[in-house]
């Protein structure tokens, strides 16, 4: 009886010691790190809003079969901006920290975020999303080209005006050619590069396109 009581006491002491060992390191960590670990385990994030991520786009790199530049903007400052990418149909993903900068156009302040994704496999379907340690955008497709032929759309000057013509042209072109590998806009992209409204209008014309088909922009 005494031996059984001794063994039970020893087991309870061991359990208490393990709880303390696993709890104290978490208490020593910054709160956001602990929260992020919990969210990562649960794979649950709030959806981003325009304050967190908008005008998301893919940018061509020197070798788009193995790398891609992802860019987006936020209204709010975000020092924890990141991109997340995975092969389509898989759960395992890679998180890529973004570099951030701030700029002001015509009195409108924007925070620009850039994530460089490398080590991709040619001819593979991926999906990505952007955000921070608490929020993520919906998943969006990202395709890496295989060796061989490709197709592209090449646009001249957008002839901006109110950008309605540019929007109609771009949307019809991508509707007629949904499988292009990338597109080029030779410029001018906008009439006034220091006017926030014009950039918003240019990106609005490409909504549903530029986040899934990479662009090679020429200012």
Predicted regions and their residues:
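Active-site neighborhood of divalent metal-dependent phosphoester/pyrophosphate hydrolases
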Residues: 148-169, 174-219
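Acidic, histidine-bearing metal-coordination/catalytic regions of metal-dependent phosphoesterases
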Residues: 2-154, 175-176
